[in-house]
Amino acid sequence: MKVIKVGTRKSKLAMTQTQQLVDQLKALHPERDFVLVPYTTKGDRLTHVSLQEIGGKGVFVKEIERALLAGEINMAVHSLKDMPAKLAEGCALGAISQREDVRDCLIFRQAGQTLADLPKGSLIGTSSIRRQVQLQAQRPDLAFKPLRGNIDTRIKKLEEGEYDAIVLAMAGLKRLGWLDQSRLHIQPLETSLCLPAISQGALAVECREEDEELLSLLAAVQDEKTAAEVAVERAVLAQMNADCTFPIAAFAQKNGQGYQLEAMLAKEDGQCIFVSLQGQDGQQLAEQAVRQLADKGAVGMPWLKK
């Protein structure tokens, strides 16, 4: 396998972060040639519709997985937060690279503002219910309006006055070099204020599970700490039978005592349920988190397993 075809979404962010990961592989395996193969997924095509309305799991990965299984490509690079807990049959996670900044951030139209001092009724752009409910818990007087599209489009809409502030992931801004541009007025949101999406900031390489040669090659870019932490978070996702469109969050940190896990679920009335646990066994910790969320009022939520 001299030439390795790498599937990715067509967006500027997806292409950039895929190229960054490929550059790591190329440095370790200079004898290999890597070719990026871009795809437009269902989630990319239907930008005028909310992800909740599109529905289903893997709206940003299904087309790429089909291409992988059909042999059109050898591997694919995804934002792990977009991937369902259960992969398509025949696919495997070949590597999870070192995690970027997990935090969300607010970007303001006017300089000098923070979440605390935004004027009452300010309009915030986000299509993420997870982000909205956590910000509303801090500022119930704010208004929210859906916002989808690539990062450049979202920032342009902010600067043109459609929103007073927008919410984006720090990881994407860093990978695209936006933080080097002084014109942005950014407030990073600490995880104590806004828990991130499950696996936010992590990239995953997917390949066919029988491709032992490629699996061996990909081991070089695996970050074991990141892989262990996101495995706990994705266990929460699996236990909830949910996907990236649902208002859930989880953030696991590996430490000397095992794992610290924070998880959040938004109820249908917008109330946020939080749990915080410490334990040695990540899988058991995820199961405990889901049980505690249920005990606190998540019973009967439509996406939880019966």
Curated annotation (Swiss-Prot):
Its EC number is 2.5.1.61. One of its GO terms (cellular component) is cytoplasm. The modification S-(dipyrrolylmethanemethyl)cysteine is found at residue 244. Pathway: Porphyrin-containing compound metabolism; protoporphyrin-IX biosynthesis; coproporphyrinogen-III from 5-aminolevulinate: step 2/4. One of its GO terms (molecular function) is hydroxymethylbilane synthase activity. It holds the Pfam family Porphobil_deamC. Binds 1 dipyrromethane group covalently. It is an enzyme of class 2 (transferase). InterPro entries: HemC (IPR000860), Porphobilin_deaminase_N (IPR022417), Porphobilinogen_deaminase_C (IPR022418), Porphobilinogen_deaminase_C_sf (IPR036803). Its cofactor is dipyrromethane. One of its GO terms (biological process) is protoporphyrinogen IX biosynthetic process. Keywords: Porphyrin biosynthesis, Transferase. It catalyses: 4 porphobilinogen + H2O = hydroxymethylbilane + 4 NH4(+). NCBIfam families: hemC. Monomer. Tetrapolymerization of the monopyrrole PBG into the hydroxymethylbilane pre-uroporphyrinogen in several discrete steps. The porphobilinogen subunits are added to the dipyrromethane group. Belongs to the HMBS family. This is Porphobilinogen deaminase.
